[in-house]
Structure formats: C-alpha cells, structure tokens
C-alpha cells in the first residue's frame, strides 16, 4: 500500500525492500556493518563499502583479516539483524576485487553493487546464487557493453544504478562534461531504461 507521496517497495531479484532507498557505499570506513545493518533493519538496503575493508576489520578486531575474510565478516555482521544488506565493490580495487566478491557471496550478501570502472567479469568471478549483481553506470553505452558481456557469461543485471555528474565517488565523466545538458539525470534515464527493457527489463535505480 502506497500513498500519493510515497515510493513503492523496491524489488530486486527475489528480494523486496519496503523502503525504496539504497544507502550508498561510502569509503573509507563510513559504510561499515553498523550503518548497513541499521538501514537494513529499518527496511532499506544497507551497503558496506569494500574500500580498505581488510585493514579496517583487522584494526577493529585486533586479528589479521585478508580481503576475503573481511568481506565475509562484515557482510555477516550487516545481515545479523535482518533486512537486505550488501556491498559496494569498486573495479578499481584491482587484485582485491575478486576476493571481495567471493567473500560477499559466501557471506550471503543480498546485493553486490559494482562501479569504479566497468564490472565486465563480475558474474564470472563466482556463481552468485541468491546474490543480486548490480552494475553502476553513467551512460547507456556503458550499460549496453556490460549487458552484452554478462549475457555471454549467462547472466543479466538484476538492476542497474545510474549515476549522473552530481553524484559522489568515481564517476564516468570528464570535467568538461559535467555541465552538459545531455548528462543531466532526467536526460540519461530514458536511455538507460531503453537498454534495460532491451535486456529483460531490470530496475533502474537513480
């Protein structure tokens, strides 16, 4: 039941968030399990940032954690109080990327959100099982490239996050492109939605 001024629930894969809000992955050390767990408990989607997670968990626990172990532990804590929780993993993390993905999936992460580059190989790292895979894009061209690559791996995005030039983080825009009318969210959205519909009709999150 929704009122005129409320957002409908957000359904991704087999999960439904009663509050249509995804708390962003803010690194380093902001989006950790306490924040993600609190958001998930209230009905939104809580997100842990994987940036420097091994060092942060090692410092907090006093026990050495590698990248895989840190993702496994932090996601487990984020999910401990119920609700929907996942992780944001940047492609730019390089060698830590795949270990973060594996740890998150093994911990039962509800979602993996991935940007900071094109996550072309994400579905091939490990069978996601119940974990929803969600790329971050800033253009229809980027999403089309991801969809075609993922389909060759036997997968389609479960949703996509569209970030415009005013978003924080690692954006796909050059400085001179930031003020272009064509890059306003309201102009990017229809193009992204068209690609989504062409590849199965997954949700577009702005």
Predicted feature residues:
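Glycine-rich beta-strand-to-loop/alpha-helix junction loops that act as flexible
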Residues: 203-206
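Active-site entrance/lid segments in N-terminal catalytic domains of soluble metabolic enzymes
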Residues: 2-200
């Amino acid at each position: 039941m929704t009122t005129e001024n409320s957002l409908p629930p957000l359904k991704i894969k087999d999960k439904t968030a009663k509050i249509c809000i995804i708390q962003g992955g803010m690194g380093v050390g902001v989006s950790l399990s306490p924040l993600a767990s609190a958001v998930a408990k209230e009905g939104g989607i809580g997100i842990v940032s994987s940036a420097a997670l091994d060092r942060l968990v090692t410092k907090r626990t006093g026990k050495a954690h590698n990248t895989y172990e840190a993702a496994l532990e932090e996601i487990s804590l984020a999910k401990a109080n119920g609700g929907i929780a996942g992780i944001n993993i940047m492609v730019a993390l390089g060698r830590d990327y795949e270990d973060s993905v594996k740890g998150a999936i093994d911990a039962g992460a509800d979602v993996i959100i991935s940007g900071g580059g094109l996550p072309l190989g994400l579905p091939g790292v490990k069978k996601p099982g119940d974990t929803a895979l969600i790329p971050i894009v800033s253009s229809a061209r980027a999403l089309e490239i991801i969809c075609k690559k993922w389909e060759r791996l036997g997968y389609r995005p479960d949703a996509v996050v569209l970030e415009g030039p005013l978003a924080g983080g690692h954006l796909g825009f050059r400085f001179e492109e930031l003020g272009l009318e064509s890059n306003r969210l309201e102009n990017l959205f229809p193009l992204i939605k068209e690609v989504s519909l062409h590849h199965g009709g997954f949700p577009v999150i702005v």
